[in-house]
Amino acid sequence: MLKYEERKLNNLTLSSFSKVGVSNDARLYIAKENTDKAYVAPEKFSSKVLTWLGKMPLFKNTEVVQKHTENIRVQDQKILQTFLHALTEKYGETAVNDALLMSRINMNKPLTQRLAVQITECVKAADEGFINLIKSKDNVGVRNAALVIKGGDTKVAEKNNDVGAESKQPLLDIALKGLKRTLPQLEQMDGNSLRENFQEMASGNGPLRSLMTNLQNLNKIPEAKQLNDYVTTLTNIQVGVARFSQWGTCGGEVERWVDKASTHELTQAVKKIHVIAKELKNVTAELEKIEAGAPMPQTMSGPTLGLARFAVSSIPINQQTQVKLSDGMPVPVNTLTFDGKPVALAGSYPKNTPDALEAHMKMLLEKECSCLVVLTSEDQMQAKQLPPYFRGSYTFGEVHTNSQKVSSASQGEAIDQYNMQLSCGEKRYTIPVLHVKNWPDHQPLPSTDQLEYLADRVKNSNQNGAPGRSSSDKHLPMIHCLGGVGRTGTMAAALVLKDNPHSNLEQVRADFRDSRNNRMLEDASQFVQLKAMQAQLLMTTAS
């Protein structure tokens, strides 16, 4: 539901910005006659005087002038957003986006009737297919051209692919407004409405078409890389027959699939779209912060889609190293690296929901993990009511498991080993499981010898070579405790030491934090035990 203030502004049409008898170069702003009406008006004389005083060194730092300058900035931003909204209502988001991208008009200037006409002419040209003409294969020589308005004529000029600074904020504003409008519509969609209204939803200003158009804006702004990476992950998720990014176009394979899909298939597709739409609200929140003056985010946790046990505010997930399934679905797991080489997969204890456990099992199966290492103690599993998913037989969605206990290892029977058979469709895989039952949270193992012994067991379970020799996220050990930062980081670091006892532990910790989050190897006592293990290994090597 739009706020009352937004509804008033959105009622302003393009004709509202054409003022008879007003100079074409007069600055325009949105005035309020009373609480029920907003209208476009030329700048008042008193405002012009204060603006002029702001250019004088003697007056520009006075409180009244500084306050006026800030008010002008807010007014200019508001009227530009309102004007672009009016343009979008008439010509559509695609035309407005293309015009902003290709135009060399300075959007940082105050809006005047002259500027409004120039922008409108650009949008008209885009709406009539001029941008498509420039980009077409028959016009290779002008594919990097830009629209330039001079003397009322539309011309073509050479331009690189970078978006000008003056266009970035308008593009972000359009993206924000589009997300606010389309996400609630997608969340209310069901299978029946998807089948009945797909053509309308995937064309024009329909929510699916509009969503994809607005998300593309982020790809045009280099500084928005974190947001764009987040969006790309979500739009690469398979929904039905195709990646979600393909759902904004009608007349293709998605439309044919929607027309023939079963009720169950449509229900599953809508369920995924709902989850994606909910996740995209994080992008909306970031854009709102930027609109309020915050800088572009330099880091951003990857999307969790409800699969993570802990909120990313507690256990962040580096989206650059986040593991993804073959259907594009991201899971709350990272690839830990040291010196640029993968060491292990690391995550929290799987969330006790069918979707989370299914995704976890699919990951073990698809990535053909060399082994699964569960560092959560038996006492903690019982206290936290954590699902013992790695022993026994279960069905998690499409994945079936059958785990048989092989042995209780030495070290005081503190380590149980299982062989867990996984099957999903025609794919089968058996993964060794090591469950360490006596490692308390935030504490070291009872002895350094046990840590070294455990590292040997993990390495011996790895039939694909020592950790760190893989060049991808496949064939690596999957390690988790409860949160996936302390014991998990310690175990992975121990594997690095077994591979090379001379490794710099401080650098290992730094690389793990870059790989996953700043909490990796956060417990001092566990780090001390790693140093003790390193000393033992170096002594053995020396002798």
UniProtKB/Swiss-Prot annotation:
Q: Which gene encodes it?
A: sptP
**According to its UniProt entry, what is the function of this protein?**
Effector proteins function to alter host cell physiology and promote bacterial survival in host tissues. This protein includes tyrosine phosphatase and GTPase activating protein (GAP) activities. After bacterial internalization, GAP mediates the reversal of the cytoskeletal changes induced by SopE. This function is independent of its tyrosine phosphatase activity, which remains unclear.
Spell out the NCBIfam families in the cross-references: PRK15375.1 (NF011902)
Subcellular localization is given as: Secreted; Host cytoplasm
User: What does the record give as the active site?
Assistant: 481 (phosphocysteine intermediate)
Chemical reaction(s) catalysed: O-phospho-L-tyrosyl-[protein] + H2O = L-tyrosyl-[protein] + phosphate
Instruction: Tell me the enzyme class.
Output: hydrolase
- State one molecular function term (GO): protein tyrosine phosphatase activity
Q: What is this protein called?
A: Secreted effector protein SptP
Major place of residence: secreted
Q: What is the effect of changing residue 481 to S?
A: Loss of phosphatase activity
Other noteworthy facts: Requires SicP as a chaperone for its stability and for secretion. The structure of the SptP-SicP complex contains four molecules of the chaperone SicP, aligned in a linear fashion and arranged in two sets of tightly bound homodimers that bind two SptP molecules. The SicP homodimers do not interact with each other, but are held together by a molecular interface formed between two SptP molecules. The chaperone-binding domain of SptP does not adopt a globular fold for interaction with SicP.
Tell me what organism the protein belongs to: Salmonella typhimurium (strain LT2 / SGSC1412 / ATCC 700720)
E.C. no:
3.1.3.48
Q: Known consequence of changing residue 246 to A?
A: Loss of RAC1 binding and GAP activity
* Site note Arginine finger, residues: 209
Q: Which domain of life is it from?
A: Bacteria
The segment(s) forming the Tyrosine-protein phosphatase domain are: 315-543
Q: Which GO terms describe its cellular component?
A: extracellular space; host cell cytoplasm
Ranges where the Bacterial Rho-GAP domain occurs? 162-293
- Which keywords appear in this protein's UniProt record, sorted alphabetically? GTPase activation, Host cytoplasm, Hydrolase, Protein phosphatase, Secreted, Virulence
